[in-house]
């Protein structure tokens, strides 16, 4: 499934939650599908979507979903340790792995080779 199709399928299920969306193209896609007050577009913050989502989840009782790309996660691996340490029940990090840094020219990430973020 392509990222756009995934975002389009998810949006109807995320009406009551806060959604933090990754830099660049994913934010543009989410905006074009459905711009809502509960959507936060992280333009110019590559690698920080998960950190921003975590911070937001620690300040509200609402569910927070962060949509992050594999390239951004790889740029800020420390956020995964912080998320695991704090472990807020109202936070979901959804990593969309397309094997590339899509917003900077589609250079391949290590997930396109031997690295798996799922394991």
Model-derived features with residue positions:
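Generic structural hydrophobic/aromatic packing signal, biased to beta-strands
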Residues: 10, 19-21, 83
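Active-site pocket-lining segments that scaffold enzyme catalytic pockets across diverse folds
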Residues: 1-16
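Thiamine diphosphate
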Residues: 4-6, 32-119
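Acidic-glycine-rich active-site phosphate/pyrophosphate-binding loop
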Residues: 17-36
